[in-house]
Amino acid sequence: MLFNLIAAHDTSHGGFFNLFHYLTFRSGCACLTALVISLALGNPFIAQLKRIQREGQPIRTVGPERHILEKAGTPTMGGMLILIALFSATLLWADLTNGFVWAVMLTTAAFGAVGFADDYLKLSKRNTTGVSKRTRLGCEFLASLIAGIWLQSLTPPELRNMVAFPFVKDVLLPLGYAFPIFAMITITGFGNAVNFTDGLDGLAIVPVVIAALVFALISYLVGNHVFADYLQLHPVPGTGELAVFCAALIGAGLGFLWFNAPPAAVFMGDTGSLSLGGALGAVAVATKHELVLCIVGGVFVAETLSVVIQIFWFKRTGRRVFLMAPLHHHFEKKGWQEPKIVIRFWIVSIVLGLCGLATLKLR
């Protein structure tokens, strides 16, 4: 909004206001703005959640036993705090005439709405069921399909139906009319992947922040013809503004971590996990780096695969591959302490983030 106001009234492009024309400046400001908002609103927001929810998030009785004792009474829906900070900072610092910004923001909001409904039903019914799986997936597929078609329409015709591969520069897989389906699977898949990962204090938010940091850089490079040509990337004009969105996500995520660090004062809930995963998926689709997200978000992929493998193998043989799924619960059952699991997953996320960055140069 500030960029649009200044662009409309300052035609000289000189002095202090010229800074607003730099993506790096606005991205930094968006990150700091989101961080300040989340830190400032955190305590009163959590206090309000405690007053409304009273008993906090329902805890699964089939999960690790200590969760019932240690996590009972902790409020959920903390994802609303992330979204307030994220959207406020993005609306303030991004170019609001950019279609990619609106497509990603509305996708994030749609997934957040599905998560909010799920959290609300869990709290009102005092169980861990929430929205039925069929209804939830149907809403997610619809939102992500619309997002895929929208993002496809904003992409240059020569890349519109293409999927790029990491580590190779000239290989593009044409999907034709199937591309929106691919985008739908990517966005919905990562929405639920982050949801699976969000099972321990601080476990999901740091990998999200790391992925957002990587994709802030990718968005900036892909949206700039000079850098894209130098790195032999496929340029997508307009995606540079998503660096502002990703930077705001970093700030909002770090602010939330302040309150979600062990022992957590608040959980993000499905409101947060679904929306953040959907946001990452949408940015990856917009920048044509869907497969790179599978590397950067490898922790999310591993958590999801552990659930899929567990269900498939149990239905086939009646036995379990893991002591419990998702994967982080397997390590809990093995006797690992929660901080050790969380920090080791963070370390893995950092390494995977560096591997994702390496794909930009190793081509």
Curated annotation (Swiss-Prot):
Record PROSITE patterns: MRAY_2
Q: Which reaction does it catalyse?
A: UDP-N-acetyl-alpha-D-muramoyl-L-alanyl-gamma-D-glutamyl-meso-2,6-diaminopimeloyl-D-alanyl-D-alanine + di-trans,octa-cis-undecaprenyl phosphate = di-trans,octa-cis-undecaprenyl diphospho-N-acetyl-alpha-D-muramoyl-L-alanyl-D-glutamyl-meso-2,6-diaminopimeloyl-D-alanyl-D-alanine + UMP
> Coiled coil: which residue ranges?
none
> Any idea of its EC number?
2.7.8.13
Query: Which pathway does the record list?
Result: Cell wall biogenesis; peptidoglycan biosynthesis
Q: Name one GO cellular component term.
A: plasma membrane
Q: Which Pfam families match?
A: Glycos_transf_4 (PF00953)
| Highest taxon of the lineage | Bacteria
Cell compartment(s), UniProt: Cell inner membrane
| The keyword Transmembrane helix is annotated on this UniProt entry | yes
Q: Which GO terms describe its molecular function?
A: metal ion binding; phospho-N-acetylmuramoyl-pentapeptide-transferase activity; UDP-N-acetylmuramoyl-L-alanyl-D-glutamyl-meso-2,6-diaminopimelyl-D-alanyl-D-alanine:undecaprenyl-phosphate transferase activity
Print the keywords alphabetically.
Answer: Cell cycle, Cell division, Cell inner membrane, Cell membrane, Cell shape, Cell wall biogenesis/degradation, Magnesium, Membrane, Metal-binding, Peptidoglycan synthesis, Transferase, Transmembrane, Transmembrane helix
Task: Please indicate if the UniProt record lists Disulfide bond as a keyword.
Answer: no
Q: How does it sit in the membrane?
A: Multi-pass membrane protein
Mark the transmembrane ranges.
Answer: 27-47, 76-96, 97-117, 137-157, 171-191, 202-222, 242-262, 265-285, 292-312, 340-360
Its GO biological process annotations read: cell division; cell wall organization; peptidoglycan biosynthetic process; regulation of cell shape
Q: Which InterPro entries match?
A: Glycosyl_transferase_4 (IPR000715), PNAcMuramoyl-5peptid_Trfase (IPR003524), PNAcMuramoyl-5peptid_Trfase_CS (IPR018480)
Q: Which cofactor does it need?
A: Mg(2+)
Give the UniProt family note: Belongs to the glycosyltransferase 4 family. MraY subfamily.
Q: What does this protein do?
A: Catalyzes the initial step of the lipid cycle reactions in the biosynthesis of the cell wall peptidoglycan: transfers peptidoglycan precursor phospho-MurNAc-pentapeptide from UDP-MurNAc-pentapeptide onto the lipid carrier undecaprenyl phosphate, yielding undecaprenyl-pyrophosphoryl-MurNAc-pentapeptide, known as lipid I.
State the protein's name. Answer: Phospho-N-acetylmuramoyl-pentapeptide-transferase
What's the source species for this entry?
Gluconobacter oxydans (strain 621H) (Gluconobacter suboxydans)
Taxonomy, top ranks, is: Bacteria, Pseudomonadati, Pseudomonadota, Alphaproteobacteria, Acetobacterales
